[in-house]
Amino acid sequence: MTIELYHTAHSTCSQKVRLTLAEKGLPERGKDWVEHEVDLGKFQQLEPAYLEMNPNGVVPTFKHDGEVIIESSAIMEYLEEAIPEPALLPKDLVARARARAWMRYLDEVPTVAVRVPSFANLFAPMRFTGKSDQEFSAHADRLPLRKQFYQRMTQKGFGKADIENACGQIRQTCERIDKAIADNGGPWILGQQYTLIDAQATPSIDRMEDMGYDDIWQDLERMKTWWADIKARPSYKATFYPGARMSERYPAHFKTAQQLREERGY
């Protein structure tokens, strides 16, 4: 069995797949699976050879014995079926359906929301300061799945209302996690079993913490305990290796949420 992963260290969607690989007993890059680091700063995800594998022009892209799988959540579910033990989804059909509903929510809400402060804090000022409107538009036109996102952001980055809305969506996510832990008996989101849901939620929460927005969940005790338990797992340490966070990857450009609040008032 040959597993290859085309990924980026600090990409939240790449991190979801690395967490799943680690939980399936394949934690080591370059040993348990073949690593292909995609440099998003050089737009390697838009090179013809990459687009042949993944026409969406995003990371990650997964290969299993030469067969290509794209989209991080689809890759996670593929790994669950290809490597059934340890199980990361409930066996009960109703519980499994509820787990998939969670995966849909996590894809549509926090995974999307976290991009707003990520670009406000780092990517927009790092990539587009000094660029002309034409250069910015040309860049957006190259991105199959992100063009509308860039058009909404504009060259100046996101404003106060956008960041507050994104933080509100992360807060909603944290409240739902906290309630699910209470309803299901914990310690994990669906109860006693650590699942793909816990893995899928982890990168968005880690990104928010890295940017200094962890005050969002400080009053949610079950959520705080869950987060501490997540960070104690070996899979977390294997996934968030040095350089896997924005603050480590781009220290000269990175701004914490607090710095932005002081500079901009939000």
Where does each model-flagged region fall?
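Short, solvent-exposed turn/loop segments enriched in Gly/Ser/Thr/Pro and often Arg
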Residues: 39, 196, 243-244
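Short polybasic/polar patches that bind polyanions
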Residues: 22, 209, 232
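Residue-level signal for nonpolar/aromatic packing positions in well-ordered secondary structure
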Residues: 62, 99, 177, 198, ...
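GST-like fold's C-terminal all-alpha helical module
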Residues: 110-228
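Long, positively charged, glycine-interspersed low-complexity recognition regions
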Residues: 218-266
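GST-like domain detector, emphasizing the conserved glutathione-binding G-site
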Residues: 1-144, 183, 257-258, 264-266
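Short, hydrophobic secondary-structure boundary micro-motifs
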Residues: 86-91, 113-114, 189-191, 217, ...
